Structures are given as structure tokens and as C-alpha cells.
């Protein structure tokens, strides 16, 4: 399994729509960086957030109550305030179409990690298609700003030695084609 370089990421995005919109260069002046890097792509967080609150005493991933989260539109302010010790969901600006022989792993940006803001995203499986739902945790005792339309995490692409027999699309993955923030789902 090989780690893919900027030239491959660029080719796959421009010729095959792997990342859309695609920024061919790293943008980093006066913003948290995003765009193409040497061996990855820095994704941007959109302006819509879902803040988990304390309306209900329990979070159940098998039976998630949407009333446990409040939608917040940060497009006007350009940032979202994540309360101390709080959790929110967001989504990428970029839409992904993964090749059948490639898996992507997403890692939080050090700019946020050094402020106690942890970003988690599960792997992008072969032939996954959609916007990426991003999990954001504020591990500090202070409120924290998360900047809309700026970098939030880096994606690295790993190409398999051979094509998988069954992709995420082939399995009918429950998050296939997701648009916007997608709450937890259980197949029934």
C-alpha cells in the first residue's frame, strides 16, 4: 500500500473528480491552511455546525435523537464558538469520490490540536462518495473558535496493492452520497 503524492492527488481530482472543489495550491496566508500539500490535501470545514447540547441525558448511537444537537449557521460571523468541553459536527466544503483501489485517512491539523481542539473523521473507504462529516471536540476549559471555510484536517491517500473485491459502494454503505452534516445511522 503506497502513500500518494501531490501529483497523483491533483491528477485524480482534476481528471476524475476525486475532490471537488479542488485547490491546486496550499492557501495559508491569514487563514488556517487548506488545499494541496506534498502528500495530502487539507480539507475545509463548511459554515454549518451541529452543537451537541444537554437537552437529553443520553446519547445513543443506535437510536440518536436529533434533538440532542442544535444547528448553527456560522456563515455571517465566519466562525463558530465551540463551548468548553463540548462536541460538534460539521461537514467539508469538498465533495469526495474515492477510487476503488484507494483508502483515505484524515488527521486533525496541528493548529487546532495545539489549542485543544481535536478533529476526528473515520476513513474514506474505497468508492465512498459524498461530503465528509467532521467530528470536533473542544478538550479545554475555555470556549474555542472554529473558523468556517478554512482548513480543519489533512487527508492522506493510500492506494492498495490490488483492487478490493467489495467497495463501500458495493456494500451499499449507509453514508454513501451524504450531503451536509449526517447524524449517526444504524442499518435496520
Swiss-Prot record:
Catalytic activity as recorded in UniProt: dCTP + H2O + H(+) = dUTP + NH4(+)
Naturally occurring in which organism (per UniProt): Helicobacter pylori (strain J99 / ATCC 700824)
Name this polypeptide is given: dCTP deaminase
Entry-linked InterPro entries: dCTP_deaminase, dUTPase-like_sf, dUTPase_trimeric
The protein's role, per its UniProt record: Catalyzes the deamination of dCTP to dUTP.
Enzyme Commission number(s) from the entry: 3.5.4.13
Residues of the active site: 135
Pathway: Pyrimidine metabolism; dUMP biosynthesis; dUMP from dCTP (dUTP route): step 1/2
Family: Belongs to the dCTP deaminase family.
An annotated GO BP: dUMP biosynthetic process
UniProtKB keywords: Hydrolase, Nucleotide metabolism, Nucleotide-binding
The keyword Electron transport belongs to this UniProt entry's keyword annotation: no
Binding residue positions for dCTP: 109-114, 154, 168, 178
Gene: dcd
GO molecular function terms attached to this record: dCTP deaminase activity; nucleotide binding
Assembly and oligomerization: Homotrimer.
Keyword Hydrolase: yes
